[in-house]
Amino acid sequence: VSHADGAGTFKSHFTGGLRAFFEYRDLGINDATKGKFSANVIRAVPGRHAEPTWHIHHLDFQMIYILQGWVTFEYEGQGEITFRPGSAALQPPGIRHREVQHSDDLELIEITSPAEFKTETVEDP
């Protein structure tokens, strides 16, 4: 059993990551699964806004669950979707998308597989 209690075994603080307008807290799943999965709490950096760049992620699995605040993503062929507390989303591998905007109090959980993956900027659809 791996237990992320925030008291020292796992990272109990937020750090920078993929996007400059977010902070990330590693929940220890990457280490516990030897890189097969990653789970992070992601929160907005107040005053920093999304850079709505179209991109894809090269991974097998990506899901988000909104804890507080809201976030709007735009997905190719589906348009804009706003996620609010309690919303969960499974993003299919390789779907072209971009974050449009988010609230300053946004906090979500993201689970990916594998833990490390490539993000590629792509042309607008």
Give residue ranges: language-model regions.
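A short hydrophobic beta-strand segment most commonly corresponding to one strand
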Residues: F37-N40, L90-Q91, S103-T121
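A short beta-loop-beta micro-motif enriched in histidine and acidic residues
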Residues: R19, A32-F37, G47-M63, G77, ...
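A short, N-terminal "cap"/entry segment at the start of jelly-roll beta-barrel domains
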Residues: V1-P46, E120-P125
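Short, surface-exposed secondary-structure boundary micro-motifs
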Residues: G94-I95, V100
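Short acidic-glycine-tyrosine-enriched beta hairpin
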Residues: G77-G94
